[in-house]
Amino acid sequence: MEDIFRYCLRPGDREVIKVSDQERESRKRKLKENVIFGEKEKENTEEEEQEGRSRASIRRKLSLPLVFLLLFFLGLLFFFYSKRRFSRISTRWTTAFSDKEGSSQEYFSFADGVVKLSKDGASYLSKTGKLIWNQAYEMGSPVVSINGDFMAIGEKSGSKLFILSTSGLVGQGESPLPIEKLSISGKGVVYALLSDKDSTYITVFSKEGRNLDIGIRSVMSGDGFPMDFSTSKDGEELLVAFSYLEQSVLKSRVVFYNFSSLGKNVGADRVVGGFTDNFSGKIVGRVHFFTNEESFVAYNGGLSFFSTRVKTSPEEKKQEGIEGTIRMICYNDSYLAVFADNTKDADKGKGNYRLLLFRKSGERLFDKPISYMGSKMEISGDKIFLYQEKTYQVYDFSGRLRYNGTTEDSLYYLRSASDFNLGGTELMLCFPNKVERVRIQ
């Protein structure tokens, strides 16, 4: 058949068939080569990918410990850097006062700056050195109370009352009896301790200075004398410490009042709780509301921390005894610092005094013997300051001494001025005729 087919072809057709056969053979060879070499290339690619994954895995295994080690050393470096004792000081700005303005009696922390208080008026200076407001008045001896963005200034043994905010004067009033003490709430409501010959009154004023005709009367021969008092942040609660004589023995009682609708329902006197046995033989010298629910009472011999979470049933949460005479206390919204004599024989060689810090819950953070005798103390930001005349010391909330400073002029007051304390901290130093902002690092 093939022979018949071959003889039927023309000469030119044979050549075409030969070429076609050659092309088929060529294509077969190329296909075989592609299959063989393609498989080899695929095998090579897979091997390379596997080697790449293996190398990446090794790099990850090596790099992760190195990263953790680096972070650990950086954290350790930051920890020791942030806890080191500061040794350098630089001045950021200085605001000077005239001789008349320099006759200041006192400085107080207010909002982010300080208030300079004198017989002729008060000035509010922000932490940037800007004078925000200046309130003129004439008072023989001004008394002040500050709570958040509000402050009250009254004339001791007089009747004038000024209520101010960070923006300036809010209200002004007159008291019917001489003013002894003030306590202002975080909303501007003012409680004023007024006195006459045989009685004392705690009267309430609105932030505009209007007498609200709400008050507490105590007869000194029976109820005793109010040693100190404090209102809560919202102005609805009042804590008062009374001292009284019983069989010729001086005693103390602490009374909680509530001036909201809850207190009104309790009774006409608005008393929701009282504590006497807790302070038997003690003299209560200071009381203060940290918040609307947490407060403390300071007496000779220790501290008591109270809760008014249940508004009609105050509760003593914790009592902390303090050996030695309590010389000074200071506080902010969250902490309470105490400066006392050191009576512990084991610590006598480390200092004659003790510095203690408590949370508002009553938790003791530290109790540290120190040798420096400051005449004033302030807690501000995350620092505690002890100072007198031309020297001051700065402690952190772990009890570490961070800076030991001196000044050329007598130091009236100081406070923290830092928003962020990485690598150092900034302070406002207040002198008779000027205020300085400095950085210690």
Predicted regions and their residues:
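N-terminal targeting leaders characterized by basic, low-complexity, disordered sequences
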Residues: 1-44
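Intrinsically disordered, low-complexity linker/loop segments enriched in Gly/Pro
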Residues: 191-192, 202-221, 228-230, 238-240, ...
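N-terminal "mature head" segments of proteins
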Residues: 36-165, 171
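Surface-exposed loop/turn elements that mediate protein-protein interactions on large endomembrane-trafficking
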Residues: 75-98, 120-136, 158-174, 201-219, ...
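Repeated scaffold domains used in trafficking and secretory/extracellular systems
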Residues: 99-109, 137-149, 177-188, 221-230, ...
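Terminal alpha-helical anchor/extension segments at protein ends
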Residues: 60, 65-76, 158, 199, ...
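Short beta-strand elements that form the blades of beta-propeller/WD-repeat-like
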Residues: 105-118, 122-123, 144-156, 160-162, ...
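Secondary-structure boundary elements
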Residues: 233-236, 262-264
